Amino acid sequence: MNKLTQGKFITFEGMDGIGKSTQSKMLYEYLKSQKIPVILTREVGGTFVAEKMREILVHEELLPMSELLQAMAARYDHMVRKIIPALKDGYIVICDRFIDSTACYQGLELENGIDLVYSLHTTLMPSLMPDITFFIDVEPDTAIKRVNSRNMSNKFDRRRIDFYKKIYSCFQELSHRFPERIKTIKASHLNPLEVHELIQKHL
């Protein structure tokens, strides 16, 4: 925790059903308890406009390129209206999903789509990447069981195991591509508190 200073950008990534949102909230509550200025946000969403875009993105069957551009447009609004101002004011920003989710969920559907996602991001906001990303690594079989046990609220929740395996492989690939930024937390056999304690050790 000694290395954690004001104005840092922390993201959580991984498949659905892995406890990613839980860990985002746990870290947020912990930092608040330490009197560290922090905000918690999410993607797709985080602002009024981006949340409206989220409704279309998660419920409508869009063309692959349309879906990617929708996600990027929502992110641009989120970055400009919320993330960047908070960082400039010295806040730690914790975001439940960010650029790596776009690479895996939208980029995989397009030829050379993963590289396209990072290229678009660099064009829109060249100086903004997370300082640290936590990839919550849970095996696809476990993740889909967790998803199936809850109400399926969007089109991604209704996808099958093959889809989850592709997404999982993508996040693994990104963790190897960006090892300085992405920290992998092996969480398949850990409870939420154990995962949280591992995350704290990286801060």
From Swiss-Prot:
GO cellular component, as recorded: cytosol
BP terms from Gene Ontology: dTDP biosynthetic process; dTTP biosynthetic process; dUDP biosynthetic process
Annotated binding of ATP, by residue: G14, M15, D16, G17, I18, G19, K20, S21
Q: Which UniProt keywords apply?
A: ATP-binding, Kinase, Nucleotide biosynthesis, Nucleotide-binding, Transferase
Q: What is its EC number?
A: 2.7.4.9
Recorded catalytic reaction(s): these are: dTMP + ATP = dTDP + ADP
Q: Name one GO molecular function term.
A: ATP binding
Q: What class of enzyme is it?
A: transferase
| Pfam families xref list | Thymidylate_kin (PF02223)
**Which InterPro entries does this chain map to?**
P-loop_NTPase, Thymidylate_kin-like_dom, Thymidylate_kin_CS, Thymidylate_kinase
Signal sequence bounds: none
Keyword Metal-binding part of the UniProt annotation: no
Top-level taxon in the UniProt lineage: Bacteria
On whether Lyase is a keyword of this UniProt record, the answer is no
The job of this chain, per UniProt, is described as:
Phosphorylation of dTMP to form dTDP in both de novo and salvage pathways of dTTP synthesis.
Family per similarity comment: Belongs to the thymidylate kinase family.
- Can you name this protein? Thymidylate kinase
- Which species is this record about? Rickettsia typhi (strain ATCC VR-144 / Wilmington)
Q: List the gene name.
A: tmk
